[in-house]
Design a protein with these regions (language model features):
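Active-site catalytic microenvironments in core metabolic enzymes, especially phosphate/sugar-handling
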Residues: 1-174
Length: 174
Protein backbone atom coordinates (compact mmCIF):
# COMPACT_ATOMS: atom_id res chain seq x y z
CA UNK A 1 0.00 0.00 0.00
CA UNK A 2 1.24 3.47 -0.78
CA UNK A 3 1.82 6.04 1.94
CA UNK A 4 -1.10 8.40 2.43
CA UNK A 5 0.72 10.58 4.98
CA UNK A 6 4.12 10.70 6.63
CA UNK A 7 4.38 10.33 10.38
CA UNK A 8 8.10 9.94 10.99
CA UNK A 9 7.54 8.24 14.34
CA UNK A 10 5.77 5.26 12.73
CA UNK A 11 6.75 2.56 10.25
CA UNK A 12 7.32 2.87 7.31
CA UNK A 13 7.69 6.67 7.35
CA UNK A 14 10.40 6.41 10.02
CA UNK A 15 12.57 4.66 7.43
CA UNK A 16 12.17 7.59 5.05
CA UNK A 17 13.29 10.01 7.78
CA UNK A 18 16.41 7.92 8.46
CA UNK A 19 17.26 7.68 4.75
CA UNK A 20 16.95 11.45 4.31
CA UNK A 21 19.27 12.03 7.29
CA UNK A 22 21.86 9.65 5.82
CA UNK A 23 21.46 10.88 2.21
CA UNK A 24 20.39 7.41 1.05
CA UNK A 25 18.52 6.90 -2.21
CA UNK A 26 15.74 4.35 -2.44
CA UNK A 27 14.07 2.82 -5.43
CA UNK A 28 10.78 1.21 -4.50
CA UNK A 29 9.39 -1.07 -7.18
CA UNK A 30 7.24 -3.70 -5.58
CA UNK A 31 4.23 -4.04 -7.88
CA UNK A 32 5.93 -3.26 -11.18
CA UNK A 33 8.73 -5.73 -10.36
CA UNK A 34 6.15 -8.42 -9.59
CA UNK A 35 4.51 -7.81 -12.97
CA UNK A 36 7.67 -7.92 -15.04
CA UNK A 37 10.11 -10.16 -13.16
CA UNK A 38 9.18 -11.83 -9.87
CA UNK A 39 6.24 -14.01 -10.93
CA UNK A 40 8.24 -15.38 -13.85
CA UNK A 41 11.32 -15.92 -11.65
CA UNK A 42 9.39 -17.85 -8.98
CA UNK A 43 7.62 -19.97 -11.59
CA UNK A 44 10.64 -20.85 -13.71
CA UNK A 45 13.65 -20.67 -11.38
CA UNK A 46 12.14 -21.67 -8.02
CA UNK A 47 9.29 -23.99 -9.01
CA UNK A 48 10.99 -25.24 -12.19
CA UNK A 49 8.14 -24.73 -14.67
CA UNK A 50 9.69 -23.51 -17.92
CA UNK A 51 6.67 -23.84 -20.22
CA UNK A 52 4.30 -20.99 -19.32
CA UNK A 53 2.38 -18.05 -20.72
CA UNK A 54 1.54 -14.72 -19.16
CA UNK A 55 -2.19 -14.14 -18.77
CA UNK A 56 -2.89 -10.52 -17.87
CA UNK A 57 -0.50 -8.32 -15.95
CA UNK A 58 0.40 -10.59 -13.04
CA UNK A 59 -0.67 -14.16 -13.71
CA UNK A 60 1.37 -16.89 -15.34
CA UNK A 61 -0.40 -20.04 -16.56
CA UNK A 62 1.48 -23.33 -16.90
CA UNK A 63 0.99 -27.04 -17.51
CA UNK A 64 1.25 -29.37 -14.53
CA UNK A 65 -0.20 -32.80 -15.42
CA UNK A 66 0.05 -34.20 -11.89
CA UNK A 67 -2.34 -35.43 -9.25
CA UNK A 68 -3.41 -32.77 -6.78
CA UNK A 69 -1.51 -34.50 -3.97
CA UNK A 70 1.69 -34.81 -6.02
CA UNK A 71 1.47 -31.15 -7.07
CA UNK A 72 0.99 -29.96 -3.47
CA UNK A 73 3.97 -32.02 -2.31
CA UNK A 74 6.09 -30.60 -5.13
CA UNK A 75 5.15 -26.99 -4.33
CA UNK A 76 5.77 -27.46 -0.59
CA UNK A 77 9.18 -28.92 -1.28
CA UNK A 78 10.32 -26.30 -3.79
CA UNK A 79 9.13 -23.38 -1.64
CA UNK A 80 10.54 -25.05 1.50
CA UNK A 81 7.21 -24.88 3.35
CA UNK A 82 6.43 -27.23 6.23
CA UNK A 83 2.68 -26.62 6.08
CA UNK A 84 0.43 -25.29 3.36
CA UNK A 85 -3.26 -24.36 3.09
CA UNK A 86 -5.04 -25.99 0.18
CA UNK A 87 -8.49 -26.34 -1.32
CA UNK A 88 -8.87 -29.58 -3.25
CA UNK A 89 -11.30 -28.73 -6.02
CA UNK A 90 -10.27 -31.58 -8.30
CA UNK A 91 -8.11 -34.72 -8.18
CA UNK A 92 -5.90 -34.00 -11.20
CA UNK A 93 -4.21 -30.73 -12.07
CA UNK A 94 -3.67 -30.28 -15.79
CA UNK A 95 -3.12 -26.50 -15.73
CA UNK A 96 -2.37 -23.99 -12.99
CA UNK A 97 -1.79 -20.28 -12.57
CA UNK A 98 0.57 -18.40 -10.26
CA UNK A 99 0.47 -14.90 -8.83
CA UNK A 100 2.99 -14.20 -6.07
CA UNK A 101 1.89 -12.10 -3.12
CA UNK A 102 -1.83 -11.60 -2.79
CA UNK A 103 -3.66 -12.49 -6.00
CA UNK A 104 -6.98 -13.88 -4.79
CA UNK A 105 -8.94 -11.09 -6.49
CA UNK A 106 -7.71 -12.46 -9.83
CA UNK A 107 -9.47 -15.82 -9.40
CA UNK A 108 -12.01 -16.37 -12.13
CA UNK A 109 -10.13 -14.29 -14.70
CA UNK A 110 -8.79 -17.40 -16.42
CA UNK A 111 -9.56 -21.11 -16.79
CA UNK A 112 -7.20 -23.41 -14.88
CA UNK A 113 -7.51 -26.35 -12.49
CA UNK A 114 -5.46 -24.80 -9.69
CA UNK A 115 -4.48 -21.29 -8.60
CA UNK A 116 -1.41 -20.54 -6.49
CA UNK A 117 -1.12 -17.29 -4.55
CA UNK A 118 -1.22 -15.99 -0.99
CA UNK A 119 -3.74 -14.45 1.40
CA UNK A 120 -6.81 -16.43 0.34
CA UNK A 121 -9.85 -15.60 2.45
CA UNK A 122 -12.40 -18.12 3.69
CA UNK A 123 -15.20 -17.18 1.29
CA UNK A 124 -12.82 -17.22 -1.67
CA UNK A 125 -11.77 -20.74 -0.68
CA UNK A 126 -15.38 -21.85 -0.26
CA UNK A 127 -16.38 -20.46 -3.65
CA UNK A 128 -13.37 -22.09 -5.31
CA UNK A 129 -14.20 -25.45 -3.73
CA UNK A 130 -17.82 -25.27 -4.93
CA UNK A 131 -16.59 -24.37 -8.43
CA UNK A 132 -14.05 -27.26 -8.49
CA UNK A 133 -11.07 -24.90 -8.56
CA UNK A 134 -8.16 -26.08 -6.45
CA UNK A 135 -6.20 -23.48 -4.48
CA UNK A 136 -2.74 -23.62 -3.00
CA UNK A 137 -2.05 -20.80 -0.56
CA UNK A 138 1.70 -20.32 -0.85
CA UNK A 139 1.61 -17.41 1.62
CA UNK A 140 2.27 -13.80 0.76
CA UNK A 141 5.74 -13.45 2.25
CA UNK A 142 6.94 -16.91 1.26
CA UNK A 143 5.99 -16.36 -2.39
CA UNK A 144 7.77 -13.00 -2.56
CA UNK A 145 10.89 -13.77 -0.53
CA UNK A 146 12.81 -14.38 -3.77
CA UNK A 147 12.68 -10.67 -4.63
CA UNK A 148 16.21 -9.92 -3.38
CA UNK A 149 17.73 -12.92 -5.14
CA UNK A 150 16.09 -12.13 -8.46
CA UNK A 151 16.89 -8.41 -8.23
CA UNK A 152 20.55 -9.13 -7.45
CA UNK A 153 20.82 -11.37 -10.52
CA UNK A 154 19.27 -8.69 -12.72
CA UNK A 155 21.49 -5.92 -11.37
CA UNK A 156 24.62 -8.05 -11.88
CA UNK A 157 23.82 -8.21 -15.60
CA UNK A 158 24.22 -4.42 -15.73
CA UNK A 159 27.18 -4.32 -13.32
CA UNK A 160 25.16 -2.26 -10.85
CA UNK A 161 26.20 -2.33 -7.19
CA UNK A 162 23.40 -2.26 -4.66
CA UNK A 163 22.80 -3.32 -1.10
CA UNK A 164 19.71 -5.49 -0.96
CA UNK A 165 18.25 -6.37 2.40
CA UNK A 166 15.81 -9.18 2.92
CA UNK A 167 12.35 -8.54 4.26
CA UNK A 168 11.25 -10.03 7.53
CA UNK A 169 8.04 -12.00 7.88
CA UNK A 170 6.10 -10.56 10.82
CA UNK A 171 4.16 -13.82 11.21
CA UNK A 172 5.43 -16.68 13.34
CA UNK A 173 4.35 -20.27 12.69
CA UNK A 174 4.13 -22.42 15.80
Amino acid sequence: KGLKSINSSEYPANLIKDMIKKDISLISMHTNYDKVVLNKFVLSEVLGYKNYEQDGEFVFKFEVNKSFEEFVTDIKSKLNLTTIRVVKGCDFIKTAALCTGSGSELIGSFKVDCFLSGDFKYHTALQSYENSLSLIDINHFESERYFGESLALNLQKFKVFATITNSINPFEYR
